[in-house]
């Protein structure tokens, strides 16, 4: 028997794309290379100035939240890699942190050290990727080439640790899957030196570059009031002068023990945001240099010990009958967290990334909601772009550092 489906009309089907001599409506993206394949903007122009901007999203929607409600808690971890795929370790950690808060797990100190190192390494890789792609959007191609070369060294380190370069899956609920490989920290120290040199090179190319500054200064200005009303976070918020960083406000892992600063901007424009990304690379280097000596002082366990939720070490599974049975139950049926709900915020490279989980005591979350920073920053384009020139739209979009894997989810 044939089924009848309701036909949905496109949202902008009846728009007349040309007005009078002074005004017109322009369709920007999703095919435009600077929309990164998934953003569509309906821009109303008066001359070359934007008087209205309407973002349309959803081209990368995959139902990630619903997938999480139909997978066991451990099964869902690799899916989080596909949210912000330029900083997948941050996604892994944010999800694991929410589940661990729900389970009230105590994470071994060595696992905390490794996690914090990976998070800051991941932050540097993400920031240098943003700077390279943003420079390419504006026309500074040489920066893209230098930055990508340095980024490769960081990806090599991630590959040495977890076997993957992009979708890392490097965090587990309760700890980390592996200890650091031999000589990995020596490679990390070399990478920090490479990052410092690359940063100096990029600053030499851009900071006093007249064209770069003209394209970014006083372009895409965000006021503190606008940032708060749109729920912005991360560098989009700190660029307005508001010093809010979840690593300081609600510290997790070892951030409470670490000495680092939260750089803020003065004007809230695209150039301020570029400067903050560069300054945050310095802070990540500073954090990792404090963590490296901490690693040697820690004991060997890298996973929490709780037989109700976490499998025993592999050696015990291979030699002890009870550990094998417990492992079988956790893999075949999944863990059953207590009834309750939790929201756990983290500071990802883009801003506040948090997972809300509502548990009914089943192996699957009853409700899983992802609070992704890029979603709010793309929505704010309807305010930020008004009054900008059409030629500056690409600069403004790029300076939000939005990734559509976490916008559409």
Swiss-Prot record:
EC number of the protein: 7.1.1.-
Pfam family, one: Complex1_49kDa
SUPFAM superfamilies assigned: HydB/Nqo4-like (SSF56762)
Catalytic activity annotation: a quinone + NADH + 5 H(+)(in) = a quinol + NAD(+) + 4 H(+)(out)
Residue stretches spanning the membrane: none
Cellular component terms (Gene Ontology): plasma membrane
Keyword NAD: yes
InterPro entries: NADH_Q_OxRdtase_suD, NDH1_su_D/H, NiFe-Hase_large
Keyword Glycosyltransferase set for record: no
Keywords: Cell inner membrane, Cell membrane, Membrane, NAD, Quinone, Translocase, Transport, Ubiquinone
Subcellular location: Cell inner membrane
GO molecular function: NAD binding; NADH:ubiquinone reductase (non-electrogenic) activity; quinone binding
Major subcellular location class: membrane
Membrane-related topology note: Peripheral membrane protein
Assembly behavior: NDH-1 is composed of 14 different subunits. Subunits NuoB, C, D, E, F, and G constitute the peripheral sector of the complex.
Family, as annotated: Belongs to the complex I 49 kDa subunit family.
NCBIfam families tied to this protein: NuoD, PRK06075.1
Function: NDH-1 shuttles electrons from NADH, via FMN and iron-sulfur (Fe-S) centers, to quinones in the respiratory chain. The immediate electron acceptor for the enzyme in this species is believed to be ubiquinone. Couples the redox reaction to proton translocation (for every two electrons transferred, four hydrogen ions are translocated across the cytoplasmic membrane), and thus conserves the redox energy in a proton gradient.
The protein, known as: NADH-quinone oxidoreductase subunit D
Organism expressing this protein natively: Helicobacter pylori (strain G27)
Source lineage: Bacteria, Pseudomonadati, Campylobacterota, Epsilonproteobacteria, Campylobacterales
Gene name of the record: nuoD
């Amino acid at each position: 028997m044939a089924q009848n489906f309701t036909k949905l009309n496109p949202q902008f089907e009846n728009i007349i794309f040309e007005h009078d001599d002074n005004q017109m409506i322009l369709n920007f993206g999703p095919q435009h290379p600077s929309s990164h394949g998934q953003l569509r903007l309906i821009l109303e122009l008066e001359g070359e100035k934007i008087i209205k901007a309407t973002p349309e999203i959803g081209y990368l929607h995959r139902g990630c939240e619903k997938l999480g409600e139909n997978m066991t808690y451990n099964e869902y971890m690799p899916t989080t890699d596909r949210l912000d795929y330029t900083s997948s370790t941050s996604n892994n950690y944010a999800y694991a942190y929410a589940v661990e808060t729900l389970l009230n797990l105590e994470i071994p100190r060595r696992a905390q050290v490794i996690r914090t190192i990976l998070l800051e390494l991941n932050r540097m890789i993400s920031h240098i990727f943003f700077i390279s792609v943003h420079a390419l959007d504006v026309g500074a191609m040489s920066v893209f080439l230098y930055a990508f070369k340095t980024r490769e060294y960081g990806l090599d380190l991630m590959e040495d640790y977890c076997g993957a370069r992009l979708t890392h899956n490097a965090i587990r609920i309760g700890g980390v899957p592996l200890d650091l490989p031999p000589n990995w920290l020596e490679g990390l120290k070399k990478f920090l030196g490479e990052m410092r040199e690359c940063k100096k090179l990029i600053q030499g190319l851009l900071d006093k570059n007249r064209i770069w500054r003209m394209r970014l200064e006083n372009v895409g200005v965000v006021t503190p009031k606008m940032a708060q009303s749109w729920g912005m976070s991360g560098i989009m918020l700190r660029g307005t002068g508001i010093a809010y960083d979840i690593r300081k406000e609600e510290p997790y892992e070892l951030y409470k023990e670490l000495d680092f600063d939260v750089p803020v901007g003065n004007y809230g424009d695209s150039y301020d945001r570029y400067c903050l990304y560069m300054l945050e690379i310095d802070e990540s280097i500073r954090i990792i240099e404090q963590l490296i000596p901490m690693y040697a002082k820690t004991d060997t366990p890298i996973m929490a010990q709780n037989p109700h939720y976490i499998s025993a070490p592999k050696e015990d599974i291979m030699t002890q009958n009870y550990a094998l049975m417990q492992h079988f139950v956790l893999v075949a049926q999944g863990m059953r967290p207590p009834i309750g709900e939790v929201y756990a915020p983290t500071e990802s490279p883009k801003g506040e990334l948090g997972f809300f989980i509502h548990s009914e005591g089943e192996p699957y979350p009853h409700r899983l909601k992802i609070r992704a920073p890029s979603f709010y920053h793309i929505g704010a384009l309807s305010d930020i772009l008004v009054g900008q020139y059409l030629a500056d739209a690409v600069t403004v979009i790029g300076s939000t550092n939005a990734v559509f894997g976490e916008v559409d989810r």
